[in-house]
Amino acid sequence: PLLVKTERVTVIPGNHDRYVYQQHGTDLFTKYFGDFFGTNELHVSKINQEWVLVGWDSAHPNDWRTAAGTVKSSTIRATEKLIDSFSDQTNFIVVNHFPLTFPEDWKFDRFHELYNLVPVRNWILQNPQIRLYLHGHIHLNWCHRLPRDSAPELLLVNSAASCSKLHTGQSSSFHQIVLEDSNVKVNPILLN
């Protein structure tokens, strides 16, 4: 294991972990990182009294020309059930490999994104207890905000390029997320 206290680490599989079926049915992500996600539909980690982290596995083997994923309907149902099991004051962070928003000049490629992106994004927006959506996949960093009617906005944070050289228009090397009571603040951190 990478750390002795696996409950302090969450590892979410991405398309590179599940591009193609492995020989002999071996799931290498589960073999090497399974302790950090678990065997259930969701990875759940209670951060504190106000915040719960929910990890989704939307990566699956595809045809060699695609890098897309799918959030299963069973994952959505399990998340609904989880949210319902907590008080209305509890805030949730969903962690998933694939983004739900993109930079303005991004050229969308349906073979590289979530197949069910729009219904998943709409479902999340209809659940105001989900306050933060963390993802990767696109090797650029950004923080987007989606407004909600009569509810706190949804913050969507991509820190997928934490180790790479900054691209034009990027303002952060990675993001620091501060959770105070029911408030969330995202600070861009720039390394020179």
What is each stretch, according to the model?
Residues 83-104:
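Short acidic, glycine-rich surface-loop motifs adjacent to enzyme active sites
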Residues 7-8, 88-91, 129:
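Short coil/turn segments at beta-strand junctions that form active-site/ligand-binding loops
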Residues 179-192:
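A short C-terminal boundary segment appended to hydrolase-like catalytic domains
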Residues 53-55, 93-95, 134:
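Structural motif
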Residues 13-23, 61-66, 99-103, 130-148, ...:
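Active-site environment of divalent metal-dependent phosphoester hydrolases
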